[in-house]
Each structure stands twice: as C-alpha cells, then as structure tokens.
A protein has these predicted regions:
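Left-handed beta-helix
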Residues: 75, 80, 85-87, 91-92, ...
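Terminal amphipathic alpha-helical/low-complexity segments used for targeting or macromolecular assembly
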Residues: 1-75, 180-182
Length: 182
C-alpha cells in the first residue's frame, strides 16, 4: 500500500526499470503507439491513483480514477487499486482482470483472471508469481510464493510455494517454481 511520495517514487522506479523504456517509447505510449509505453502509462496512473486514494486526496484520486478507468476500458486491463504489490510486470496489452491480492514481483500475461467464486472471496497470491497466458484463479484460494501458473490453467484449489501448476483444473507438474520460466 503506497502511502508516501517517497514510496510512490520507489515503486515507480522499480517498475519502470522492468520495462526499459526510452523517452520516445514513453511518449508514443501516451498516444497508444507503443505497447510497452501503453502498459507503463496504465501502470503509472494506477500507482498514482493508489497513492492518492490511500492518502485521502479526494480530488486527485478522482482524477486518477478517471484516467485509469479510461485506459481500462480502452485496453481491457482492470486491476483494482492496492491489489498488486510492488514490482508488477505486465507482458502485453490485453484483457487482464485482477480482483484479488498479488504479492511482490509478479509477472502477468494477457487474459489473466483472478476473481472470487460463488463465495465472492478473492484469491490471495504470494510473491514472485508468474501468471501464464489465459490463466484463471477462481475463489478464495491461496497461491504460495515462487509459483508458475501455466498457460490456460484454471486454479481452483490452494497451491503450495515453489512449484509449477498447469491444466484444468490445475495440478502441480514440478517443484522448481519460476526457475524454468525466466
């Protein structure tokens, strides 16, 4: 939860370094012409919205809420404020729905969904989780740290730390975690 300008600056610097954007890519992202620029623009606005929301800056949080929602509708990325901790890396522009808690240094591909099930309790994921393309995490489950969720996997039960899961429903396929994926 970002509650100070110093912390906001630190989080933005960490996340900015993962995209390695040039000035021209950042500018092109403002006009929707650079994929990494678009992602960074969305992420930058989301983090500033979180900061202003957490500090009860009503006018600024309303402005950033509008800016984040505008990009969400345009590109299909819907991440709730304070849902993802620092170090989030979004790989591609596309449908992303996060309505749960995700720890530090997560990697998120397109068509990823973290949603509550019928009980409407959101999933909780640990640090350093890799979400493959089209992965879905449903219900009030817990995903441990250092976990890879394979492409198209549907996770419906708790996942222990340091493993890779895949399939429908997701099952552990190895215990090496993200070492195989990076």
């Amino acid at each position: 939860m970002i509650t100070s300008k110093k912390e906001l600056k630190r989080v933005l610097e960490i996340e900015s370094n993962s995209y390695q954007l040039s000035i021209s890519q950042r500018i092109l992202g403002l006009f929707g012409l650079s994929e990494r620029g678009i992602i960074w623009n969305y992420q930058n606005r989301l983090r500033k919205y979180e900061y202003h929301l957490n500090c009860n800056h009503r006018v600024r949080s309303t402005i950033y809420h509008f800016l984040v929602n505008r990009l969400s509708f345009r590109y299909g990325m819907a991440i709730e404020p304070n849902a993802v901790d620092e170090g989030m890396h979004i790989c591609h522009v596309g449908k992303i729905l996060i309505r749960g808690k995700v720890g530090k240094y997560s990697t998120i591909h397109i068509h990823v969904s973290l949603v509550g099930g019928a009980c409407d309790i959101a999933p909780v994921c640990g640090d350093n989780v890799y979400f493959g393309i089209g992965s879905t995490i449903v219900g009030g489950i817990k995903v441990g740290s250092n976990v890879c969720i394979g492409a198209g996997a549907v996770v419906t039960s708790d996942v222990e730390s340091n493993c890779t899961v895949a399939g429908v429903p997701a099952k552990i396929i190895n215990r090496r975690g993200p070492l195989d994926w990076h």
